[in-house]
Amino acid sequence: MSEELKPQPDPSKSAQHKPSTTRAEQIDQAKAKLAGADSEGRNRNPLVLDDTYSDLRENNRVVMRNAIALNLDNFRAAPEGFNPRPVRTFPPLREIAAPFASVIVPNYNGAHHLPVVLDALRSQQFTDFEVIVVDDASSDESVLLLENRYPDVRLIANRRNMGFVYSCNTGAAVARGRMIVLLNSDTEPEPTWLAELVKVFVAHPRAAMVTSKLLLFNRRDTLHTTGDMLGVDGVPRNRGVWEQDHGQYDGATDVFSGCGGATAYRREVWQALGGYDEEFWMYLEDVDFGFRARLAGWEAIFAPQARVYHHLSASGGDLLASYYVGRNTIWLIAKNMPRSLLRRNALAILGGQLAIGLAAARNWRGAAAQARLRGQLAGLLGLARQLQKRRTIQPRRQIEDAELARMFVAK
């Protein structure tokens, strides 16, 4: 038979009858692919050709297959509802409601005053409040006293002296109440004090602050303040200071700002305005906050029945007070006074500062007078920083200049 007549093999059948690749060959091919063998069969990864641990790897694979199968069998054989990870039940967390008020007592070397104010707080008729004492690195027994006798008080101890204003802000930062109340450590509030503050606070939702009636500790018929007022000359005034209390201010509840020695602040306003300006350090920081709150459209209310007795020297002349009042008055005006009112009251403002400076110069030998002049000089030297703050404060005003001007007093 010729070659042409010979039957040709069927390609499909020959492929079917071709011997298949062995399992070992398939494994070798897979290893070569994973190892990246080149076209000549040279392996670029010598570890793949190392059979030192091949038996161990194979044994591990067998063990894992058996373990998986065993787990599956056990799971299928488990009773209905079986859970290999039992659910652990825990008692519900106890929710601690935030108090309505947080009373913050800044303290510096006031161990001799603290028992009076803290015992008075324990005697308050209104009880939904917490007490926070911020100790400003006292060198007396204040911290030891608080830890031993007043464990219910939240104590924050500054590692170094940071100033009164910083302590107020620190306490307010951890306060949980809707009403943030600042109370000096050298005071004694009456048992109804906090209840009266709360009553007025709730009745005046537009009040950023509610301030107390402060009377002298040792002359309890004599006023320290019934609220802060601001003169047309930009100088703050304690309304009623040194006057005998006959209730003459009880009906005049609208004030410019509250005295930080015993005033309640609305939490959201405090946070929105950033609290006290820590650059003030001490003195007039409360008037500065009140000025900013007024510019933002909020009110300040006097609560005449919220009575607090305050240790205050009638003689004055404190060097720190003289310095910081002299400096901070200038900063207060520079930060907050609208431009139109600066122009309108320019003569009164300049005249007021000159009169204070001249009076201090005439008494130059007095330490308090020197401190006042140094404070005024420091106020002028620090104007640049206050003018930067002014550029943030003034565009946010929510009150007309004419309405603000009506709040200023002539004397």
Where would I find each of the regions flagged by the language model?
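N-proximal low-complexity "stem/linker" segments adjacent to membrane-targeting elements
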Residues: E3-P7, Y53, N60-S123
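Glycine-rich, basic loop-to-helix element that forms the pyrophosphate-binding segment
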Residues: A157-A175, S185, E196
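Short aromatic/hydrophobic "clamp" motif used to bind/position activated sugar donors
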Residues: I180
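Active-site-adjacent helix/loop segment of glycosyltransferases
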Residues: A300-Q388, A402
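Cell-envelope/extracellular polymer assembly enzymes that use nucleotide-activated donors
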Residues: P99-S102, E130, D288
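A short, conserved alpha-helix in the catalytic core of glycosyltransferases
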Residues: D254-R307
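Conserved donor NDP-sugar-binding/catalytic core segment of glycosyltransferases
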Residues: E188-V235
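A conserved acidic beta->alpha catalytic loop
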Residues: A120, T127, D135-L144, R160
